[in-house]
């Protein structure tokens, strides 16, 4: 395409677009942002806006689409959610200042990982950008959040890369454009950069200049050992500089993260435990949505961070626990006060990049004053002492903002009335000129009436014609010679006088001067605030931490969470543990014990589908996870030994993008666990081997269980339907059988959801199918085939599946409506009698009594 064949404005656009070929360009044209050529076609499709044309190039109409500049944020938000980056090109020159088109330039680039505008961000989600730099041995990771100032780096390996990205939940991933770049499971939000931008030497130079130091050893980074991590951090910092058109002032140092800081969880574990997202991709009900009682958005984001980063440092955990205990009598008034706190963290970020708005500063001022009034009793908690000591440090900033910013400023700086009265004498004088014009006009009107003797004379103003003197048609002919005609109306004439024109010029000039001065003063306030960014970020972090800790206190008090104990020996002991999410979704939840130690490391868990095996296993993992965040846990008591990682293999689905079947996904996850789990790991395995034939599945499940017992020696919960596996405790002393009980009566089945010793006796598969609504004909056919299989199993001896039962007598007709014989009824009566015998009403707490009452009621219903 030839530039000479288009207008000067389009030539300017093409020059700007050539520098941003991989982005959509929002090109400012008056009150619109316009897009051209392929950008217009793509934007019209993504945003559902009209595609039209503007001008021609080489005789071909130029495709064009546009959005109003005042509504641009909503369109940008939609594009960013789709993973698009947008270059914002503004008019920076004066209209008509030269012969060519008004000067324009790209003032910022909006990308998924570098957002600071509140309209483009989810309130309760942290927005991170991650850079990935590989070499032959390691992968260097660096990540940052422009909202919080977080800036960290880490060394990892190829096999752990996807797990790290799942932990960080990156909105944008920077990758070198080279053949050595590893393949990622996610392709969304990926930005390719030239490989040379990840060079360690260039990265170290940029980082040392930014932090004002000679080398990076103070950050724990050695030039040779951490070269790829330094390269990633340098590429990331440079990318932020390029997209924001400035070097950010608020990145909070650079820290090197290691695996030993947090309990490890791979991507499958985070997904299966539904920490912040359900298996179906929803935000609720999840662990996060269930626990989030936070009063601020900052607190909610920190809570999500803590849930994804359970601590291993016992001292830090205990410090949080002590703070939670200290707040149990104070959390309600504290949360009431915190509800008045704005999102200081994100306001500070907008101050840092220079796009804070007037009401941001007003909200910051009010929030800092509110924080300074928080009065807490630390009750021996050193963490609370540290947190509450932060807030008085920001009082000088609050006082400055009180003096500088109107109590309720305008939304936009261009509308004026932002800088407070008394802050600047010249601005006050300019405002006086504008605001006291009414007095001048009244005085002028009275004076002119007296001078001219014209009774219809009025002095008025409108935005089109400015100031004027109006006379009726009958008196207009008597106007003095110094009255210059300005406008003729049907029944009146409007005039201007030299005195009124001089006043008009003064007022208009004062308005322009006041707006210009307000902008200058506002920019000065922002610049001064940038020097206080460390204190603001510190206050934001302290407020968020207080919010989360008070939420933990609320959970302890209102949901009967207890403080877990930590041991230095291998143990997971939980008394009457509850699933923190499920118990909020059901009327009655059955609590269960868990006992794992050096004598019992693997629990073989059997029982019917829908019996609660998966819920129980997840419950144990979530209690362990919560304990390591400093939160109290849903149980009567809990003692937990050293834990380094949590693994889960629960459920699976096809990975069509990678051409992997459900069974292949299952085996890949299992292999990862067997290669990485240690003696201090917690492993959840659900029905390993079910995706293939019975013999293959049984063999694989047996091998996996033995590997966990003999090699990994991890704490393991192993749910299975293979009866052969229940013999493992005979050969391995550290394995133990447990089952979830259920009862059948007539056509009904009752799931007791209670963990009991020993293996389950049968599957209840057909009963569950009946509950699911299978047709009677299909159920009868299933019962018939089950009996035939049982006959074959009895003849061939091997009993491969726990679903097998004793074969029926020859000649017996299968009866789908008869699930329980008299022996089972007697067995049930024995269970009920034993349960009643064991009850000691005087020793039960109200909650325990209620739980037992519901359980006995369910038992009675099953035989009624």
From Swiss-Prot:
In this chain, ATP is annotated as bound at 607-614
The protein's matches in SUPFAM superfamilies, at most eight in alphabetical order, are given as: DNA repair protein MutS, domain I, DNA repair protein MutS, domain II, DNA repair protein MutS, domain III, P-loop containing nucleoside triphosphate hydrolases
Where do the coiled-coil regions begin and end?
none
Q: CDD domains, per this entry?
A: ABC_MutS1
> Sorted alphabetically, which keywords does the UniProt record give?
ATP-binding, DNA damage, DNA repair, DNA-binding, Nucleotide-binding
UniProt similarity note: Belongs to the DNA mismatch repair MutS family.
The name this protein goes by in its record: DNA mismatch repair protein MutS
Give the organism the record lists: Neisseria meningitidis serogroup C (strain 053442)
Taxonomic classification: Bacteria, Pseudomonadati, Pseudomonadota, Betaproteobacteria, Neisseriales
């Amino acid at each position: 395409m030839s530039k000479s064949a288009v207008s000067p404005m389009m030539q300017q656009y093409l020059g700007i677009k050539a520098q941003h070929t991989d982005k959509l360009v929002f090109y400012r044209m008056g009150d619109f942002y316009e897009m051209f050529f392929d950008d217009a076609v793509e934007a019209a499709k993504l945003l559902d806006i009209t595609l039209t044309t503007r001008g021609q190039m080489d005789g071909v109409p130029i495709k064009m689409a546009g959005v109003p500049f005042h509504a641009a944020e909503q369109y940008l938000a939609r594009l960013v959610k789709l993973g698009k980056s947008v270059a914002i090109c503004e008019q920076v020159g004066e209209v008509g200042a030269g012969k060519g088109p008004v000067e324009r330039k790209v003032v910022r680039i909006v990308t998924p990982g570098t957002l600071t505008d509140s309209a483009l961000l989810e309130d309760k989600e942290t927005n991170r950008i991650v850079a990935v730099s590989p070499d032959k041995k390691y992968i260097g990771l660096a990540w940052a959040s422009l909202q919080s100032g977080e800036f960290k780096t880490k060394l990892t390996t190829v096999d752990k890369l996807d797990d790290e990205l799942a932990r960080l939940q990156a909105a944008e991933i920077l990758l070198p454009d080279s053949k050595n770049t590893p393949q990622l499971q996610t392709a969304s939000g990926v930005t390719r950069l030239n490989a040379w931008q990840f060079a360690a030497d260039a990265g170290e130079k940029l980082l040392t200049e930014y932090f004002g130091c000679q080398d990076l050893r103070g950050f724990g980074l050695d030039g040779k050992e951490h070269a790829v991590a330094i390269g990633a951090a340098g590429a990331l910092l440079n990318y932020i500089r390029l997209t924001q058109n400035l070097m950010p002032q608020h990145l909070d140092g650079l820290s090197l993260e290691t695996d030993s800081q947090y309990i490890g969880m791979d991507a499958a574990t985070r997904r299966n435990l539904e920490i912040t997202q359900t298996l179906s991709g929803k935000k609720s009900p999840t662990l996060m949505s269930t626990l989030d009682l936070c009063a601020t958005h900052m607190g909610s984001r920190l809570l999500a961070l803590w849930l994804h980063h359970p601590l291993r440092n016992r001292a830090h955990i205990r410090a949080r626990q002590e703070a939670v205990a200290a707040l149990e009598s104070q959390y309600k008034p504290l949360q009431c006060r915190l509800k008045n706190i704005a999102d200081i963290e994100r306001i500070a970020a907008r101050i840092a990049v220079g796009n804070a708005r007037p009401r941001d500063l007003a909200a910051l001022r009010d929030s800092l004053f509110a924080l300074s009034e928080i009065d807490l009793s630390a009750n021996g908690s050193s963490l609370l002492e540290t947190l509450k000591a932060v807030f008085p440090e920001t009082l000088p900033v609050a006082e400055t903002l009180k003096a500088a910013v109107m109590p309720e400023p305008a939304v936009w700086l261009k509308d004026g009335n932002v800088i407070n009265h008394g802050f600047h004498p010249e601005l006050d004088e300019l405002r006086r000129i504008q605001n006291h014009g009414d007095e001048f006009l009244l005085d002028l009107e009275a004076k002119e009436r007296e001078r001219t003797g014209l009774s219809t004379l009025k002095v008025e103003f409108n935005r089109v014609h400015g100031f004027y003197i109006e006379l009726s048609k009958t008196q207009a002919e008597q106007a003095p010679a110094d009255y210059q005609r300005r406008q003729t109306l049907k029944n009146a004439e409007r005039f201007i006088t030299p005195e009124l024109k001089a006043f008009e010029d003064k007022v208009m000039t004062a308005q322009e001067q006041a707006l210009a001065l307000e902008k200058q003063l506002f920019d000065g306030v922002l610049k001064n605030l940038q020097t206080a960014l460390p204190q603001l970020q510190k206050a934001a972090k302290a407020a968020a931490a207080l919010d989360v800790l008070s939420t933990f206190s609320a959970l302890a008090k209102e949901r009967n969470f207890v403080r877990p104990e930590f041991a230095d020996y291998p143990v997971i002991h939980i008394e009457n543990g509850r699933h923190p999410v499920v118990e909020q979704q059901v009327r009655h939840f059955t609590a269960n014990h868990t006992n794992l130690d050096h004598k019992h490391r693997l629990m073989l868990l059997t029982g019917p589908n829908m019996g609660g095996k998966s819920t129980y296993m997840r419950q144990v993992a979530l209690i362990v996870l919560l304990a390591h965040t400093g939160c109290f846990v849903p149980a009567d008591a809990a003692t937990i030994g050293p834990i380094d990682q949590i693994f889960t293999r629960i459920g699976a689905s096809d990975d069509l993008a990678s051409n992997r079947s459900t069974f292949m996904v299952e085996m890949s996850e299992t292999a990862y666990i067997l290669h990485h789990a240690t003696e201090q790991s917690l492993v959840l395995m659900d029905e390993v081997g079910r995706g293939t034939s019975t013999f293959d599945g049984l063999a694989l499940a047996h091998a996996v269980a033995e590997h966990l017992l003999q090699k990994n020696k991890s704490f393991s919960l192993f749910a299975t339907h293979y009866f052969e596996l229940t013999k493992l405790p005979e050969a391995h002393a550290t394995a133990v059988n447990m089952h979830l009980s259920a009862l059948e009566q007539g056509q009904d089945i009752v799931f007791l959801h209670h963990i009991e010793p020993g293996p389950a006796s049968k599957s209840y598969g057909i009963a569950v199918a009946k509950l699911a609504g299978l047709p009677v004909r299909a159920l009868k056919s299933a019962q018939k085939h089950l009996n035939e299989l049982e006959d074959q199993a009895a003849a061939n001896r091997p009993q491969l599946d726990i679903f097998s039962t004793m074969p029926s007598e020859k000649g017996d007709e299968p009866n789908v409506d008869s699930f329980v014989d008299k022996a089972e009824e007697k067995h049930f009566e024995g269970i009920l009698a034993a349960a009643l015998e064991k009850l000691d009403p005087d020793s039960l707490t109200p909650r325990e009594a209620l739980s037992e009452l519901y359980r006995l009621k369910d038992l009675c219903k099953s035989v009624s």
